[in-house]
Amino acid sequence: MPESLIAGIPVHFPFEPYPVQRAYMEKVIQCLRDGTNGVLESPTGTGKTLSLLCSSLAWIRTRQSEHQQQMVKIEKADFSGLAGGATGGELSDLGKTMGRANNWGVPKVIYASRTHSQLTQAMRELKRTAYANMRSVVLGSRDQLCIHPEVMREQGNSNKTNMCKLRVHSKTCTFQMRVESRKDHPDLRGPSIMDIEDLVKVGQRLKICPYFASRELVPQADITFMPYNYLLDPKARKANKIELGNTIVILDEAHNIEKICEESASVQIKSSDVAMAIEDVTHIMQVFASGESQDMAGDEPKDFTLDDLTLLKEMLLELEKAIDAVVVDNAAEGTTFPASLMYELLGKANFTYGNVATIVSLLDKLVQYLLVASQQMSIRKGGTFTMLSDLLTIVFANKQDVMSKVYASFKVHVQMEESKQGHGKQQGAKQQGGWLGKGTIAAASGTSKVAKIINFWCFNPGFGMEQLLNTQVRSVILTSGTLAPLKPLIAELAIPVAQHLENPHIVDQSQVYVKIIGTGPDRQQLISNYANRDNPKYISSLGQTILNVSRIVPDGLLVFFPSYPMLNKCVDAWQASGLWADISCKKPIFLEPRSKDQFTSTMEEFYQAIRDSKGAVFMAVCRGKVSEGLDFADRNGRAVIITGLPFPPLKDPKVILKRRYLEANRTRENQLLSGQEWYNLDATRAVNQAIGRVIRHRNDYGAILLCDSRFKDASQVQQLSKWIRGHLGDRPQCSPFGPIVRELRQFFKNAEANMKLPDERETDAPLETVCKTEDEPLAAIPKLKREPGSNATFKSANESAIKVEMANSIKTWTPADYASAAGRKLGGAAPSAMDFMSRLDSNVSSIDFNCCTDSKSGSSDLVKIHKRERSSPTLPESSSQVSKKRYKLVENIKVEPSSSQAKAAPEERADFLRALRSLVTQDQFRRFGKALLEYKNGTYESFQDLMAILLDVLSAPKVRYMLVGMRKYLKNEHKDEFDRRVGSL
């Protein structure tokens, strides 16, 4: 690989670095050399991660070489000769050399990011470099690395963690017990870089625990990859035994670092948590009193006594009493108190700095006990004890000598908690009675107290960073594509910064088209503020804007909304008006789901649609998974539409208190933002992140359309990324919609003519395996989930895929027979007429709705069907056809979908499914699929169920042609009734 001398350090880079990459690496090396901190911004797509890894590891390698030379010099020294006749200068030089060798040491690198998918991307970048042979390891959770079938059956990370601890403590986990004897195995210590998936595979092969094996690799690793919380959460740092002395801490994707620092120091406890903890302690006491404890927990002696339980219960009862006594003036919104209230509440229950370590230890022992007991009887597994332990750990992490700072930076906000049924006064009165009663003090006293939620919120991110700096780290580097403005970030984190950088983008001006669209095609103002977001005219105009843009933008179009409620509101309105169907005719639409399982399958379908058809539209939400971590390079994202500014909820108590904190602590010297400036910046940073999904590398190109007139305001423009501001000019203005359409069409025409076509491997890779893994049968470990190994397509895409964290737990609505049907090879036995899902892997037919040429045969009303191979993307028949297309600008006219008489349902099953998916919501499509599969092998009742769903989903005039098209998939005995019911519509 080419070698470049940067800041005096030879750096091997996969290619000759661009000026922005060279500037970035120079800043990194300066930080490491001087032992200082840096805040570095470089836009997404500039090779930030690659530059970061190469520069830091090049410096580490240089230091290792220097260290070895110093050690050799010491070994060769003739001490006897020096002692007898050496000069004072020689002795002094040798002394300095020995001092450097002993105390200087070679620092380690800790690379942290927000999610494991981002860490996997970074490790994949490292594999491309000359530093791929340096020792590395990634730390993950038990949820991701554990291969013990019993532990993996537990629900929730907390239960898995506690069950793992229990098995390790009782020496019943054979995987963990083998780690010591096999930790030096070549497969584990080899030169290859192992991510989470690789560690799991090695663990399965060697039959050792990947979780504990990875911890064994840390001391010898040159670079360790881990998520943020392992660093910033003191409890996680202690649990994972992370030593930070003389380390270089790199926080990538650090645009959310303030929030992460605040959240790591915040905690919540509910009245119901305390009440359940009292019940759990009481239950254990009853077991002790009855003599059943030995049967429940085996022959091992207990780590606690009945006296310990009695004391803990008394403390919990006092805590419950103290919480009940808190007066909430505003029941609807809650009441805010000084931070001292939390210490007062805990103090009344005798939780103090002096005994908190003992109490936390007792709570952890009780969790272990309940985990064992829960194997034999139906009881809770100690989750409330874990919550209480977290509360005490976080609240008392702040030392007594900094309490004045704590009181200025924290607030307690008390909200009302909805009481659960069955926790009433009568029940408590019956159960109260002596120490073995389960009732609470409130119940015993005959009063009915309202349950509360106690929030202990931190508003000073400097607390988390200060704890990090106090561990004697060598350097801290914060980096992201969207950190600006840097001064207020540095001020809030209270971190001394010697190096800072705001890089321009690596792409040419001609590769990016940026415009502010202030009005839609009907001249309706586009502004997604509180006063206008419910305006039907605005929602319609926004839909018309997306429709017109979808006609021009090739391949993938991303549309980001400020929030999920706004996204759902627009979808409902567009489906009712017919705009949804019209957009779907141009490109199939995908919505960002909120659940992890659905998200993974939806992304797969989106990438497949990009390859198989004329593109697709993905509608998502700022701050969601799509906007934060996924790569939409090349065809996957040719344009991004931002529909509004995603401001935090104005009335949210946490937002109100954050603004008050900034106003109260802002001075001329500390340069903190005002409350309003922070509020605006929080929205703009989310926009910057969403925009960064599109331009992903040097040869990429795309359009950025800001569809909210507020983007022209100077306060908003100044908070956009520097490279975007360069495209908007000194005085940004809203552009008329008509000229934008012409310019946008010309932009893509020029880009397609002048830019190099993307490599098909890069384009098709992103989520083919990413988000999907399958269950593979393992003889030793049933139900263990791994990446698929049989599908050649998945194998070829694996190297460049973006791994979505915990993708191995995906479950979709598709039954097992759907998967087997979809996997039928071409040329095999023909599927039956009822096997509706069977041809998704075969060559399919598609309807070219964009075709503007007349068919030479048949009626002009017919839709021309084009055959295509699934393995290649759909292309226009010729470039001349594309240039002859005419796009009609919709203005002041409500667009109605074509009548059902002019449409016919697709003939092929796969095309029918795709067309149906684009016309209905995800929930409707899932209901349809489930009913259809039940009908396939079902009875007359299943036909009635299917008909009910069909009539509910497809009875509207604009989609009735799809209802008619369903007839041929029905059994013969049901077709007459189908005709009667459809005919009566």
UniProtKB/Swiss-Prot annotation:
Gene Ontology biological process terms, A to Z: DNA recombination; DNA repair; DNA replication; male germ-line stem cell population maintenance; negative regulation of DNA recombination; negative regulation of t-circle formation; regulation of double-strand break repair via homologous recombination; telomeric loop disassembly
UniProt subcellular location: Nucleus
Family per record: Belongs to the helicase family. RAD3/XPD subfamily.
Positions occupied by motif DEAH box: 252-255
Name listed for the protein in its UniProt record: Regulator of telomere elongation helicase 1 homolog
This enzyme's EC code(s): 5.6.2.-
Keywords: 4Fe-4S, ATP-binding, DNA damage, DNA repair, DNA-binding, Helicase, Hydrolase, Iron, Iron-sulfur, Isomerase, Metal-binding, Nucleotide-binding, Nucleus, Phosphoprotein
Gene Ontology CC annotations of this record: nucleus
InterPro entries, per the entry: ATP-dep_Helicase_C, DinG/Rad3-like, Helic_SF1/SF2_ATP-bd_DinG/Rad3, Helicase-like_DEXD_c2, HHD_RTEL1, P-loop_NTPase, RAD3-like_helicase_DEAD, Rad3/Chl1-like
Domain Helicase ATP-binding: 7-303
Positions of [4Fe-4S] cluster binding: C146, C164, C173, C209
Naturally occurring in which organism (per UniProt): Drosophila erecta (Fruit fly)
Residue numbers of Phosphothreonine PTMs: T874
Classification lineage: Eukaryota, Metazoa, Ecdysozoa, Arthropoda, Hexapoda
NCBIfam families: rad3 (TIGR00604)
UniProt KW Transferase keyword: no
HAMAP family: RTEL1
Entry superkingdom: Eukaryota
Entry GO MF terms: 4 iron, 4 sulfur cluster binding; ATP binding; ATP hydrolysis activity; chromatin binding; DNA binding; DNA helicase activity; DNA polymerase binding; metal ion binding
